[in-house]
């Protein structure tokens, strides 16, 4: 089930948060930058993990779901785009995002979590994806794993 909420993703009551990241080791804008600033440990582990795979076998990163535990949250870095840019191209790979989300939801079941918060238009604003496609992936996987997905939008943004 998907529920839409207006509010700050980083202060959401859900223990788990997921967001899309690129495979370049950069959290330079959007929600990724906000998470980097709020949770330095998440960025440190993402950077180390990305750099390791960039050096050894970069093909392993797309579709990966990295979980980082902080003091009060578990953050899932979803490797759904290989590159990034600001030129209007689509950098989000729906296939890689779906694989990462599938792994994320599977890991949630293993640790006993049933709710997750994600940003509205994940993979769409910065990644250039189509929200209807991403939303469809979320709906299918939330039903498959019986996970409640809370989609957060800051006040002033359109949210269903």
Where are these regions (language model features)?
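Macrodomain-like recognition of ADP-ribose-binding/processing modules
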Residues: 1-160
